[in-house]
Amino acid sequence: MVREGGSLPVRGGLLLTGLPFFFLGGPGYQSGRSFQGAWDLGHILFFALLGALLLGLINRRPAPPAYGRTFAFVFTAVFAAGLAVELLQMQSGGRTPDVTDLVRNQLGCLLAFAIFAPRDWRWTRLFRAGVAGLLVLALWPLSRSLIDETLAVRQFPVLADFETPFETRRWVHPSQLRTQTDIVRHGDRAARVQLTTARFSGVSLFHFPGDWRGYRSLRFSVYNPREEPMELNCRIHDVHHRDHGNAFQDRYNQQFQLQQGWNDLTVSLDRVRDAPRGRTMD
């Protein structure tokens, strides 16, 4: 029912090679968005191989089952294997199971069926077109990250001015950011920060070129719409700070009093470098 392609031992060998990567390596705290996006696509590749292996094994039977039964069996088996991986990751590394990973796993299974679907099945073309569309959607986060990372390098030393489409994704808690054109300091756009009632409400620039050698200051502008002053806490830290306890004395901290209207603020990078107690910031 399903035509077999490739070598089953090769598929099995590739699966055994890829299996350890679910538990070793992978993106870390400071990993770039494109690396994270590319790593996530590994779920699709791995489970496409698993689906192809199962299809090949079923096809070797003298009387393979009907195509619908084959689809149901392989789709369910891939889901069970993916769920087992998520649970093992939770047990071995403390990871929280990720529903989007399970979705990628099933997309990999669908990809295997799209590749090895029988030519005489009347829905083959439509099925392949649908899977291709889903793959485009799955590739979009990686594509978007690559585009913005390229723009960030070209824009440097400007870290963010919100003139390009994906800059809000350089920030932590991007849902609290909304680009707008009503109140801007320069150019056509600025970002509006929606504060919450949380004790530490705000946003953090997280993805940006990290080599600031040769520059003396960090400058940014903040608009305060209120008549009364507003206190802004600015903090800058490096990977060492994150990996060694997040101590207050191990990062740069400064408070600014924002007056009504635009406030143009400057941070000395020499002070940032020397801020951690007993070391210099990377």
Task: Annotate each language-model stretch with its function.
Residues 1-100, 106-198, 206-210, 216-219, ...:
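Bulky hydrophobic segments
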Residues 199-201, 228, 242, 275:
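Residue-level signal for secondary-structure boundary sites
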Residues 204, 209, 277-279:
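Short histidine-centered beta-strand/loop micro-motifs
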Residues 210-211, 225:
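Short polar/acidic secondary-structure junctions
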Residues 220, 264-282:
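Extracellular beta-strand ligand-recognition surfaces/modules
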Residues 221-227, 237-239, 270-272:
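Solvent-exposed strand-to-loop "edge" motifs in beta-rich extracellular domains
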